[in-house]
Swiss-Prot record:
This is Protein translocase subunit SecA. It catalyses: ATP + H2O + cellular proteinSide 1 = ADP + phosphate + cellular proteinSide 2. The gene is secA. Keywords: ATP-binding, Cell membrane, Cytoplasm, Membrane, Metal-binding, Nucleotide-binding, Protein transport, Translocase, Translocation, Transport, Zinc. PANTHER family: CHLOROPLAST PROTEIN-TRANSPORTING ATPASE, SECA INNER MEMBRANE COMPONENT OF SEC PROTEIN SECRETION SYSTEM. It comes from Clostridium perfringens (strain 13 / Type A). Its EC number is 7.4.2.8. It is an enzyme of class 7 (translocase). Its main location: membrane. Monomer and homodimer. Part of the essential Sec protein translocation apparatus which comprises SecA, SecYEG and auxiliary proteins SecDF. Other proteins may also be involved. May bind 1 zinc ion per subunit. Part of the Sec protein translocase complex. Interacts with the SecYEG preprotein conducting channel. Has a central role in coupling the hydrolysis of ATP to the transfer of proteins into and across the cell membrane, serving as an ATP-driven molecular motor driving the stepwise translocation of polypeptide chains across the membrane.
Amino acid sequence: MGLFDKIFGSYSDREVKRITPIVDKIDSLGPEMEKLSDEELKQKTFEFKDRYAKGESLDDMLPEAFAVCREASTRVLGMKHYREQLIGGIVLHQGRIAEMKTGEGKTLVATLPVYLNAIAGKGVHVITVNDYLATRDKEWMGQLYEFLGLTTGVIVHGLTNDQRREAYNADITYGTNNEFGFDYLRDNMVIYKEERVQRPLHYCIVDEVDSILIDEARTPLIISGAGSKSTDLYKIADFFVKKLREEEDYTIDEKAHAAMLTDKGVAEAEKAFGIENYADANNMELQHHITQALKANYVMKRDKDYMVKDDEIAIVDEFTGRLMEGRRYSDGLHQAIEAKEGVKVQRESKTLATITFQNYFRMYTKLAGMTGTALTEETEFREIYGLDVVVIPTHRPVQRQDHSDLVFKTAKGKYDAIVEEIIETHKTGQPVLVGTTSIEKSEYLSSLLKKKGVPHKVLNARYHEQEAEIVSHAGELGNITIATNMAGRGTDIKLGEGVLEVGGLKIIGTERHESRRIDNQLRGRSGRQGDKGHSRFYISLEDDLMRIFGSEKLQSVVDRLGLEETEAIESKMVTKSIENAQKKVEGNNFDIRKTLLGYDDVMNKQREVIYKQRSQVLEGENLEDSVQAMIEDVITNAVQAHLGNIDEDDFEKELGDLIKYLEDIMLPHGKFTVEELKTNSNEEITRKFIECAREIYKEKEEFVGSEQMREIERVIILRVVDTKWMDHIDDMDHLKQGIGLRAYKQQDPIQAYQMEGSAMFDEMINNIKIDTVRYLFHVKVEAEKPQRERVAKETGASHGGDSQEIKKKPVKKEPKVGRNDLCPCGSGKKYKSCCGREVV
């Protein structure tokens, strides 16, 4: 703590002091609310809604609304909010993050701002980390909201569109971040506005906000369709890399979580695949497959990063140890792991729509969050999301004793000491919760305890179903529970009878996580609501964190001391060294997330433009003006591209090419000749073409009817926009993967990505106009209602991992470029004078 904080108190202390008068006001309204009957209390909700409609702000109503909610909670749930919980509720209403320790009643705290903001009638979303918690909280707290005259809904996997729409139309909606994000993407793929399920994003409270906004920030939500690529190359690449030797043919960079070929490895690849130059751009697809095969075989670890379950690869969440059902690694990594493990390699998918949680949650008008551990990531919350963190005081002082780390020379010595400690503690009856960082390590520790005949329960991704049940009993006398990281988060560990007398729940950490926050979460499982408890971490110099990021200074101290395998050191210097290693990793991860956000912001702005225009097409009753403007643009651009600034000698040739080009898109064949138009100015030619196109379009509309034509326009525009946008997502992803490999002198890669991405976006918009006009003029119309259809059948949704390998270039299915067309590279020159010079 700095000198300033010692004198004036921390930022959180000052904020809590500022909020206290509002809490006093809520307290003073208590007796008045107690006098109201149940019906009168319920009527208060309708009174608040009326006052809001007349212009009174939610801030002005806060003390009274919180007092109403508090009284209703006392009657319905038998729980009255503490003053500290009122402070937490105010912080959440203000659009901030409330850090509240485990067991302080976060679920109850959320009812206050949820009730107040539901009065606005625009919908309140409460985000939880899994379907179990979403359903539990909706049923539990839903009693309170329904007593107060509000409706609640829950979004879980497997609901129909009608069920989802009903849940979103409720005053308060519970659900997981994945479900909300996927619904947003799906809503922006519909052909008819009635198919949308979400309302505009208004107010959102994210439970376990650090887990969702930081731990999962780098993994985008992806809706995908089946790709067309063969899976054979994954098996061939896997066969090739399995024969390679570490250091000689490839190297592993543990910090970057990557593997790469050495010069000798490159020579082996050239020999094996019969190619001259591995680095050649023509071999990009092969490079991609080999890179992913290397990562799958030598970086990704079975039972730590993924599991083989029912002959499929299931991803393990590194932060919770849970299986991430239905998710697949993106960019071909999942297929590479399937090839490695000898299970069926599924086809690589094509991305239809994607968004990161960072950008999804930043779309809410007001965002708030709560967690037991946020302060260590305060800078990131502020810089990325504009959220500040306020630490809420605990209702009772924390009595848990956090002991210094014990550092061992080897992993074996560490595990032997842990087993010894568990056995000694078990003799007293004190319950023990042991936190591990992977399934593999939890099962290794379990096998050691079995050999000693110590009864215990294991909680990891393999036994996901019993998670809440096992966790809820972890605080009972004599129980020993081994848990992968934060599995069971969101379920309280209540102490059984007689446990306080033996010292409360003991927490043993088997190694430090690379994030201090995850360590704090493990510690926080003990000592809830002022209970006694103990915590200690056991560390070895062979642990991943110490091996990759630990200081050489610490290693030399241990060497000088000549520690035996079973001996440990315990000192402030050691703890400091470990914390510095963690800070180094946290800083590194923050930089990666910030860089990714820089790239994603470019894509996000483009997505906003496309989705906004798409929404206007969905809502628009009359698209005629937009279509007429497209026709004009296509003709004007074509005339300019063919006839602008050309030699007189080339004029007739270019005019002939122009007529053919526009005949292919919209003009009737043989209507215009070079002979007839060659004496006209460019402006006259443009006018004649536009008049002709309008006349044809008018005849088509008269035949089919205006209402029918608008319907056809809507469907075709949406189909073209979606198809081009999907291709653009692939192109932008390929650009992002390749841009860092270029030697940009004095130029920021993100800036280069922005400039080139902008040019590609403009080209896409132009191609949308051309294809829309072509389809509208070529579509065979009948005088009947067009069939409603989806643009792309969604075949899968995944929360794919990010990847830093080179992505193979997507094949763009576009019309052949004419020699006199504008060059697609975006230079503004004709194709024949630019990239077309090299084409024979």
